UniProtKB/Swiss-Prot annotation:
Chief location: membrane
Protein name (database record): NADH-quinone oxidoreductase subunit B 2
Lineage: Bacteria, Pseudomonadati, Pseudomonadota, Alphaproteobacteria, Hyphomicrobiales
Keywords: 4Fe-4S, Cell inner membrane, Cell membrane, Iron, Iron-sulfur, Membrane, Metal-binding, NAD, Quinone, Translocase, Transport, Ubiquinone
GO cellular component: plasma membrane; respiratory chain complex I
Length: 200
């Protein structure tokens, strides 16, 4: 796309050097709202302009709300709990994904089991799990929680917390990084969107 003799010079008003900036929500190239060609946007816009309200399945609405407001409680048993705490700190900021910590199991949707589960601690894990309201989810974090890890052959260790409570997401690692746990949280949200929340 070179300049031919007689055409506008580079930098002239006919051919600006800087792309025009968007004004509000309008695309400067077309003058239409940004995303106006998106099929979803068109369907929603047509339905809203026709009826004045939006029709959706209640289950879809509940699922959407639940994935954006998961409350988690910590069940930190060993060194993995340090990475779990790091995930909620400002560097990773899990709350921007709608994943906020709670202190009580009665207010929590998700329990993160992080660390080595011993035989003495197993009844406490089950008791805390039973106090959580339905639907409830469990993330098993780290090799020890997943399958006993380094202490697998110890007489005092449960070889995986899935023997005590049902697990939804396994996060591998010894210890897993905060990024890995955050990825596990996003996988849980994806799973909830896929299977719904009314029946589990």
């Amino acid at each position: 796309m070179g300049l031919s003799p007689g055409s506008a010079k580079l930098g002239s008003p006919a051919q600006p050097l800087i792309a025009p900036a968007a004004t509000g929500i309008l695309d400067p190239r077309t003058g239409r709202p940004v995303g106006a060609d998106d099929r979803f946007f068109v369907e929603v816009n047509n339905e809203l302009s026709d009826k004045g309200f939006f029709v959706a399945a209640t289950d879809d609405l509940i699922t959407w709300a639940r994935t954006g407001s998961l409350m988690w409680m910590t069940f930190g048993l060993a060194c993995c709990a340090v990475e779990m705490m790091q995930m909620s700190m400002p560097r990773y900021d899990a709350e921007r994904f709608g994943f906020a910590p709670r202190a009580s199991p009665r207010q929590s949707d998700v329990m993160i089991v992080a660390g080595t589960l011993t035989n003495k601690m197993a009844p406490a894990l089950r008791k805390v799990y039973d106090q959580m309201p339905e639907p409830r989810y469990v993330i098993s974090m780290g090799s020890c929680a997943n399958g006993g890890g380094y202490y697998h052959y110890s007489y005092a260790v449960v070889r995986g917390c899935d023997r005590i409570v049902p697990i939804d997401i396994y996060v591998p690692g010894c210890p897993p990084t905060a990024e890995a746990l955050l990825y596990g949280v996003m996988l849980l949200q994806k799973k909830i969107r896929r299977i719904g929340t009314i029946e589990r």
